[in-house]
């Protein structure tokens, strides 16, 4: 289930602004095993086709033109490649196949036996390093990648602020002359500290930082160092600051261990502990969340399609779940962790839903579609979307914020 979005949720609960929370990542992956395809495309030069060996991206070149200028890059973006793939799947020309056998057979012509044997080992090791299940799937399905292709398809949507996504906290950048005033203004009153959120003294790095994608692991490590140095500077500049919390240690203990206390109090009310009128176990909460997000918030079951009415219904169900979530119960420390993870997932999901509802366009075709606003609308929506949960009013507030180009964009307007 990847990470539960704790960074996003805790920032939101603190009243920090979030940015671009409508952005999600839906990569193509090896079907059922979730193995990565990037190495095959880039290192092994493999090609993907529909069931009839047609290059689906080239085939839908005219269709992709309606997303210009973004479709005019030398390498078509991931979401638009997904868009072409989804057309093939919906029109019955699946499955989509990654032709590992073509790539390896071509490589074999250029290599001696020793080099080729090493390449095959690399192909397997790529999955054994990152996704053991994919190697297991190949084995159990009798697939030898040098002889047979493998199915690929788009994944379920997920969040990340560091890889190919940009959802996360709205953070301050460096206090340098080249940074536009628009990107400094929100922090003028509380201080210009690199990677500080709009809550004074709350810093982020890596996945949690929004509008800062394509950092990957190494970039996230660097960003962690940037944030750490800025935190030290903040501490030195605020030596007299003495943070205090309202609650006592005992009150916090009761809150944190609340799900365990609830289970102990009510576990004997029924014969089977999973079915109990007094609580929900973490698995139940997660199943409800996944079902409603998939069906109403542009999940796989609707081919990533949604609209205003679906989103509003999803929000209604999500807020019912948020209310029921207060009755989470945990049998042990593992389920206690799961109970809190689910709380964070629900908060993150709510922010995501509200952002998709707020942005009245389809900014990322292939990742999600607004059926009622099916096009990219740069005239009105080439901007940041910001949200903030107000701890005083207990309400979400959403706004747009100007996007200022710093580095010249060859695809920009």
What are these regions, as identified by a protein language model?
Residues 1-36, 217-230:
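Glycine-rich loop(s) and the adjacent beta-strand/alpha-helix scaffold that form part
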Residues 22-213, 295-413:
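Mobile, glycine/GP-rich and aromatic-enriched active-site lid/loop segments adjacent to catalytic centers
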Residues 191-193, 197-260:
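Catalytic phosphate/nucleotide-handling subdomain of diverse soluble enzymes
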Residues 14-15, 52-53, 228-239, 360:
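A generic secondary-structure signal for well-formed alpha-helical elements
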Residues 236-331:
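Long, amphipathic alpha-helical stalk/connector segments used for oligomerization, subunit docking
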Residues 16-23, 234-246, 367-368:
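Acidic/polar loop patches that form or flank catalytic/metal-binding clefts of enzymes
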């Amino acid at each position: 289930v990847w990470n539960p979005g704790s960074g996003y949720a805790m920032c939101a609960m603190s009243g920090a602004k979030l940015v671009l929370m409508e952005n999600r990542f839906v990569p193509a992956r090896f079907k059922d095993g979730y193995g990565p395809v990037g190495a095959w495309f880039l290192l092994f030069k493999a090609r993907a086709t529909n069931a009839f060996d047609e290059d689906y991206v080239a085939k839908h070149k005219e269709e992709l033109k309606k997303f210009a200028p973004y479709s005019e890059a030398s390498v078509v973006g991931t979401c638009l490649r997904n868009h072409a793939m989804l057309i093939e799947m919906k029109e019955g020309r699946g499955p989509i196949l990654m032709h590992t056998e073509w790539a390896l057979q071509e490589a074999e012509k250029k290599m001696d036996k020793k080099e080729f044997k090493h390449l095959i080992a690399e192909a397997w090791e790529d999955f054994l390093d990152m996704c053991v299940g994919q190697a297991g799937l190949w084995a159990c399905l009798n697939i030898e990648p040098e002889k047979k292709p493998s199915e690929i398809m788009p994944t379920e949507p997920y969040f990340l602020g560091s890889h190919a996504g940009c959802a996360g906290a709205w953070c301050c950048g460096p206090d340098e002359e080249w940074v536009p005033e628009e990107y400094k203004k929100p922090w003028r009153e509380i201080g210009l500290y690199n990677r500080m959120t709009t809550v004074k003294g709350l810093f982020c790095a890596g996945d949690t930082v929004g509008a800062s994608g394509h950092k990957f692991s190494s970039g996230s490590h660097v960003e962690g160092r940037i944030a750490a140095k800025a935190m030290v500077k903040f501490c030195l500049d605020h030596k007299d600051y003495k943070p205090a919390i309202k609650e006592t240690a005992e009150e916090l203990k009761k809150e944190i261990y609340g799900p365990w206390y609830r289970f102990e109090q009510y576990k004997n009310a029924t014969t089977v502990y999973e079915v109990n009128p007094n609580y929900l176990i973490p698995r139940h909460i997660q199943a409800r969340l996944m079902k409603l997000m998939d069906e109403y918030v542009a999940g796989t079951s609707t081919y990533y399609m949604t609209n205003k009415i679906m989103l509003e219904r999803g929000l209604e169900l999500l807020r019912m779940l948020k209310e029921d979530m207060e009755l989470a119960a945990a049998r042990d420390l593992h389920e206690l962790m799961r109970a809190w993870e689910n709380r964070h997932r629900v908060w993150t999901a709510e922010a995501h839903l509200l952002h998709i509802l707020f942005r009245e366009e389809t900014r990322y075709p292939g990742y999600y579609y607004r059926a009622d606003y099916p096009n990219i609308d740069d005239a009105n929506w080439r901007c940041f979307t910001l949200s903030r949960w107000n701890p005083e009013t207990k309400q979400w507030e959403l706004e747009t914020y100007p996007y200022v180009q710093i580095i010249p964009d060859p695809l920009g307007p």
